[in-house]
Structure formats: C-alpha cells, structure tokens
Amino acid sequence: VALINNQFLPYPYYVKPGAVRSPAQILQWQVLPNTVPAKFCQAQPTTMARHPHPRLSFMAIPPKKNQDKTDIPSINTIATAESTITPTTEAIVDTVATQEASSEVIESAPEAKTDQVTSTVV
C-alpha cells in the first residue's frame, strides 16, 4: 500500500495495487507448440502468439472518515396511518307488487323502486 500525498489533493489517498507482477513474470511473447499431428508436420516452425502487455491498474481509496464526528439526523420513516373515510353509494332495489283491492287479475309487472343509500366505510 502506497501513500500518495499531493498538494492538489485535499487529503492523502492510499493506493491499493490491483495487479502487481515482477518483470520476470510478464512475458510479452509466449511460444506455443504447433498442434498439428506428427504425421502432417514437415519442419514447421513453432507459432508465436502475441500477448498484450497487461497494464498495472491502481485504485485510489480515500482514507476512512471517523463516523463519530458526523451527526446523522434521525428521520422518522414510519408514517402514521390515518383512516380515510370513503363514502360509497349503494343502490338498493325494492321490488314491490302493488295489489289493488279488487277482484280483477292484475297482469302488470311489479314496480321497481330504487333508493340511494350513502354509507361510510372505514
């Protein structure tokens, strides 16, 4: 871990290397054997595969801040449940067959009476 102290940075950064290898481990060219079967080989040279040079990656990590210094405001995230009264309108249908006091047979349809009733549901 390296410490970077720069005049342009407000506070020092600790640098954590992402990939560190010694130069002996980093090979730019790697020799690969030829994979053709022996009966087809006629003094073919070995194939060379070019592997890109991996760049070293660094991550700049700011130092940990003291959590005791900053006051975290407590916010009440629990909302109080208030009951909302929602009026509902229901239609009540009364079917009344009116019969007159006579000896005649009434073949009319029964009268339909509709009343509006408003109730509050909580």
Swiss-Prot record:
Pfam families associated with the record: Casein_kappa (PF00997)
Site (described: Cleavage): F58, M59
Superkingdom in the source lineage: Eukaryota
GO term, biological process aspect, one: lactation
Subcellular location: Secreted
Key words of the record: Glycoprotein, Milk protein, Phosphoprotein, Secreted
Tissue note: Mammary gland specific. Secreted in milk.
The keyword Glycoprotein appears for this protein: yes
Modified residues (Phosphoserine): S102, S119
Keyword Glycoprotein among UniProt keywords: yes
Chain intervals for the UniProt region annotation (Disordered): 100-122
Designated name of the protein: Kappa-casein
Gene encoding the protein: CSN3
